[in-house]
Amino acid sequence: MKKINKQALIDAVEQKQLKEYVPEFGAGDEVNVAIKLREKEKVRVQNFTGTVLRRRGRGISETFMVRKTTDGIPIEKNFQIHNPNIDIEVKRRGKVRRAYISYMRERSGKSAKIKEKKS
């Protein structure tokens, strides 16, 4: 009887759950995350547009953090990249030198702007 490698089995299951297409984005980019919410029979789409603070992890557990300010109140949300209930759309590319731009939390107004990356 052949012994099954646990990690190979885990990798096979995870591979099936990965999204086929994930847009290329990173810290500093402005993205729109469309969250599909199910309310009984109805499916509603809620948009969350903001700046990506970081992207971390690998495989099925890969996540990214988005920050937006609404009426002067900052909101940060973590999303799973391979979540089937979200769609990610890159609005504009930002030019930053860090993988995690935590310094954006202290900034407001004009100093919180990120330059656009020239393509």
Swiss-Prot record:
GO cellular component: cytosolic large ribosomal subunit
A Gene Ontology BP annotation from the UniProt entry: translation
SUPFAM superfamilies named in the record: Translation proteins SH3-like domain
This protein's UniProt keywords: Ribonucleoprotein, Ribosomal protein
The organism's place on the tree of life at top rank: Bacteria
GO molecular function: structural constituent of ribosome
InterPro entries: Ribosomal_bL19 (IPR001857), Ribosomal_bL19_CS (IPR018257), Ribosomal_bL19_sf (IPR038657), Translation_prot_SH3-like_sf (IPR008991)
Role: This protein is located at the 30S-50S ribosomal subunit interface and may play a role in the structure and function of the aminoacyl-tRNA binding site.
Family: Belongs to the bacterial ribosomal protein bL19 family.
NCBIfam families: rplS_bact
Protein name as it appears in the record: Large ribosomal subunit protein bL19
Organism: Mycoplasma genitalium (strain ATCC 33530 / DSM 19775 / NCTC 10195 / G37) (Mycoplasmoides genitalium)
